[in-house]
Amino acid sequence: MPISLGQAFARNFLGNAPQWYKAAILLFLLINPIAFYLDPFIAGWLLVVEFIFTLAMALKCYPLQPGGLLAIEAVLIGMTSAKQVKHELVANIEVLLLLVFMVAGIYFMKQLLLYVFTKLLIRIHSKTLLSLAFCLVSAFLSAFLDALTVIAVVISVATGFYAIYHKVSSGKEFGNPHDHTDDDAVNELNRQHLDDFRAFLRSLMMHAAIGTALGGVCTLVGEPQNLIIGEQAGWNFGEFAIRMSPVTVPVFICGLLTCVLVEKCRWFGYGAKLPDAVRRIMEDYNRYEEAGRTAQDKAKLIVQAAIALWLILGLAMHLAAVGLIGLSVIVLATSLTGITEEHSLGKAFQEALPFTALLAVFFSVVAVIIDQQLFKPVIQWVLAAEPDAQLALFYLANGLLSMVSDNVFVGTVYINEVKTALLNNAISREQFELLAVAINTGTNLPSVATPNGQAAFLFMLTSALAPLLRLSYGRMVWMALPYTLVLGLVGFFSVEMLLGPLTDWFYQAGWLVLDNVAPAALPVLH
């Protein structure tokens, strides 16, 4: 039946998204200019809530399009400027380079990753031990590498596992080409196993994601905001780890205990075991790969292992920007394994580029937060508090704001304000260093509550794997909830009760030396 041009425009708008979703986005676009005219501050927070809505509905429509429309309108009506958006993008160029090059680099190491993790999956029969292994490995890697890189590895591995089983359950051989996004060919008898396998992979993904937060908070190079805070406090790698330890050690231990508890008790969507049918297929796949592995294949694995070593050393020692190391991985991995066709290279960039564009939209929202000073009332309230109450309030304020905004931005804002207070002699050097710990742990730990707070979580939510595993925004929040409560509360208790006394003990033991000379330069805010 022919349709009018107007109906065609309506159908084309946001494609296959539900009609109610399209209506909601149009309503947002209509309301925002009116709200901005009446009260810019309220309009700013309204935009933040709307953007969170687009993330929450990621399985209905990829957030880039609706979020991008909201961001474009925000610039047009004056909530922020194109110059401020560009400033945010320039300030975060390393994150953007990382997404463009590092994620693509990991793609060319899939053979090695599948080889290692298939062995791990087959040999560890206990789901609890396997979950703990994923959490620990992610935590260890995230202490030295960027969390986005670690999540890219985990996504690559999980996608590989999913594709293998999906291919066999669709009646195909290991060597046959297959589209693992299409369930139509999956045998009816295998659908329950496929659903169980999805639940199994979902839980492993979430344990690994939490592991990146547990490890990332511990060291100077673990997260971008750690570097900013550590630089302003004048801490080296060792001093940073020691100063954070009164909070990070109890949190790390309790985080691992939570991993065991939720698996054993099958709470919050955890506890799904690997179906026997899937395990047999993985074992068959392992034997198939071993039998068919040629000298060239072995050479590729050796090359990829050497590149993995370079990747870890390069990132841990900060030999270059993360994205540039990723570019070197692409060049080395492709040239030494014989991948030279342009279309073969292009596949590697398919996963990361949509998210890179989405992150640019996210930074546009951060630009609105800055220009409309949405966090200013909270910051002023915390700084006006008594010194004894400041540690807990800084931790809580950072945690709450990091749940809705980029934790790098939140950490930078607060360390700026605290540094200003130090230079104006409003607080002592001792108080400044304790507050720096509270800010760092506050931005890193409670932010696991939602995908908004950590770029690695957002990357996982918007990856091509998330819809395959039925990993929605709501499900991520639900599965993160036990970790949010444990990490947040243990972190709060440690900041309030342990940080001061243990820091004093470190001074007495000679592990730390108080530097009364404050650095003169303020960090540059995004």
Curated annotation (Swiss-Prot):
Keywords noted in UniProt: Antiport, Cell inner membrane, Cell membrane, Ion transport, Membrane, Sodium, Sodium transport, Transmembrane, Transmembrane helix, Transport
Gene Ontology MF term list: sodium:proton antiporter activity
Bilayer topology term: Multi-pass membrane protein
Substrates-to-products reaction catalysed: 2 Na(+)(in) + 3 H(+)(out) = 2 Na(+)(out) + 3 H(+)(in)
Pfam family for this entry, one: NhaB
Keyword field contains Metal-binding: no
Subcellular location: Cell inner membrane
Chief subcellular location: membrane
Entry's family note: Belongs to the NhaB Na(+)/H(+) (TC 2.A.34) antiporter family.
Function noted in UniProt: Na(+)/H(+) antiporter that extrudes sodium in exchange for external protons.
Protein name: Na(+)/H(+) antiporter NhaB
Species annotation: Aeromonas hydrophila subsp. hydrophila (strain ATCC 7966 / DSM 30187 / BCRC 13018 / CCUG 14551 / JCM 1027 / KCTC 2358 / NCIMB 9240 / NCTC 8049)
Species classification: Bacteria, Pseudomonadati, Pseudomonadota, Gammaproteobacteria, Aeromonadales
